[in-house]
Amino acid sequence: MSTKRSQNRKEIRSYIRIVRNSVTLTKKYDESNKIVRTAFNCNIIYNAKNIACFLSFDGEINTYPLILKLWLNNKNVFLPIVSSSYSRKLFFVPFTCKSILYYNQYNILQPFYNMKDIILESDLDLIIVPLVAFDCRGVRLGMGGGFYDQFLKNWERKKFIPIGMAYDFQFVNYIPRQPWDISLPIVLTPNKIHFFHQN
């Protein structure tokens, strides 16, 4: 990605979303299966038990192959629930092959749930996080809603580890950072596990 383009958050978001939505079905299939192999070469994922993930939206890399692999390896999978656009809060509920899904206010699939199903943050081992772009410092650029920024705030003080998941082309040299932006310690792409030093 050009240096000029990488200087503007809005341009980065727009450009990557266009590229992401232009990925062919064959490429999507290949890349989503490659990232499963990459994920299970990451000891943090391999050894985790309670794993929060997400369902793909807006051209994001397909997470279903990874979720299936997690189930087959006896991992407990959880999906995010968006409480409201006002509070910008996320919480996570179990996702199994028997879960019934519906479209929320953002047209994103999420499970029907009871309040008693919500898992405590302290019981999550890791959270696989969607993103639009990431840079050489691990700075994450999301869709702009702020839900994950809010949930991941001060994640270093919590038990879970956040791990980004993206196509390789979603890496950019530099993202102009805002105070609310989160730096991820790890980002998975089909061809690489990116580790970032946390200051």
Curated annotation (Swiss-Prot):
Transmembrane segments: none annotated. Pfam families: 5-FTHF_cyc-lig (PF01812). Signal peptide: none annotated. ATP binds at R9, K10, E11, I12, R13, G142, M143, G144, G145, G146, F147, Y148, D149, D181. Belongs to the 5-formyltetrahydrofolate cyclo-ligase family. It comes from the Bacteria. GO terms for biological process: folic acid-containing compound biosynthetic process; tetrahydrofolate interconversion. InterPro entries: FTHF_cligase (IPR002698), FTHF_cligase-like_sf (IPR024185), NagB/RpiA_transferase-like (IPR037171). This is Uncharacterized protein BUsg_396. Disulfide bonds: none annotated. It comes from Buchnera aphidicola subsp. Schizaphis graminum (strain Sg). One of its GO terms (molecular function) is ATP binding. Keywords: ATP-binding, Nucleotide-binding.
